[in-house]
Each structure stands twice: as structure tokens, then as C-alpha cells.
Amino acid sequence: MADSSMGLHEAREDLSPGTLERHRGLVSLMEELEAMDWYQQRIDATADAELREVLAHNRDEETEHAAMSLEWMRRKDAVLDQHLRQYLFTSGSIVAIEEAEEGGGGEAAGDGSLGIGSLK
């Protein structure tokens, strides 16, 4: 992994194997998201309809890869899992869901919970 925003910020020898694997997964996710963006830009820019179809197919493949990488990360990170479960596949205001979870009022959460946070 080259030195960049995707590089390690601490000495490799100071990092646990789990942190290194998480970093590897995160970099892969970032690369897939970037590829999705690049393909979309190419789709917008091309005048060739057949090339547009090929590029859209490629973009959709990268989208699948991003989803798979995100799911791997969710399975490895309990806090990420919690936040994804809170926000993904909801409707309504994302901010209202967050405010309801933190007890700040707002509208009910999109999951039918009436916006009532954990009682733990």
C-alpha cells in the first residue's frame, strides 16, 4: 500500500494484524467507491451508446464490490454494524433518525421504532 491518504499513518510494526486487515479492507472499499465515480463520469462524458452500456455494467460491478467490502467491514466492526443498522434502509430524514436516537426529539425513526432509543 503506497503512501497516500490510503497509506498507514502509524508504523506497521506498531499495528496489530487485525488493524492491518481492517486497513486493507478499507483501502479496497475506497478504491471501489472511486472506481464507481470514475465510471459514472465516463458514462456522462461518452457520446457512444454502446460504450455507455459497457461502462454502466463496469460501474455496477464496482458497486457490487463496494457493497461486499462494506459488508466485510460491518461484520468485523461492532460499532460500524450498529451505525449501519441505525441508518441504512430507512426513510425520512437521516438527521431526525440520529436526533431521535440521541434523545434530541425529531421525527420517528424510519424503522417503526417511534424514534425511541435503546433503554440499556
Model-identified regions with their sequence ranges:
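Non-heme di-metal
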Residues: 1-120
